[in-house]
């Protein structure tokens, strides 16, 4: 299957596994990547050393692309953001905040950045900040999102997207 997302991420299918806190660990991330999608390690509130270990274990199980979901409310987010670069991870999704302060570091390291957004305004802000794509997510997701439904967010965000 060939789509803009498969081209961007180097995967077989346009499927990005959620970066679910305490669930999305290296076994799941590697399995999803091996199946042709993009597996994610959910960094959640983990210390940087734990995220580093998860990345290394994922690399032992797959040579396919995978990423890390950085929860920006995590007090360790700045250190986790650096670990992503140090370990050569090429895909980052973000949630629970604005990744703007990490964007330059990630982009200089060749990281594809995909923030999770809950509104058109946030999607446009992320586009201006250099995001490669966004995930439009609503209140059903169980994440740190507002009161808009996913379908509403998706429709408005896709209408507003430059491409």
Put a short name on every predicted segment:
Residues 156-161:
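Conserved small/polar residues in nucleotide/adenosyl-binding loops
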């Amino acid at each position: 299957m060939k789509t803009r997302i498969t081209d961007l991420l180097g995967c077989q299918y346009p499927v990005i596994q959620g970066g679910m806190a305490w669930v999305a660990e290296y076994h799941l991330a590697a399995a999803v990547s091996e199946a042709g999608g993009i597996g994610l390690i959910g960094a959640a509130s983990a210390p940087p050393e734990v995220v580093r270990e998860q990345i290394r274990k994922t690399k032992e199980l797959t040579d396919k692309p995978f990423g890390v979901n950085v929860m920006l409310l995590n007090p360790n987010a700045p250190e986790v953001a650096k670990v992503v670069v140090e370990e050569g991870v090429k895909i980052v999704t973000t949630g629970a905040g604005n990744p703007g302060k990490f964007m330059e570091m990630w982009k200089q390291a060749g990281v594809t950045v995909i923030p999770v957004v809950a509104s058109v305004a946030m999607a446009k802000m992320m586009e201006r900040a250099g995001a490669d794509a966004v995930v439009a997510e609503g209140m059903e997701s169980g994440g740190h999102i507002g009161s808009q439904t996913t379908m509403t967010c998706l429709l408005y965000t896709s209408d507003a997207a430059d491409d």
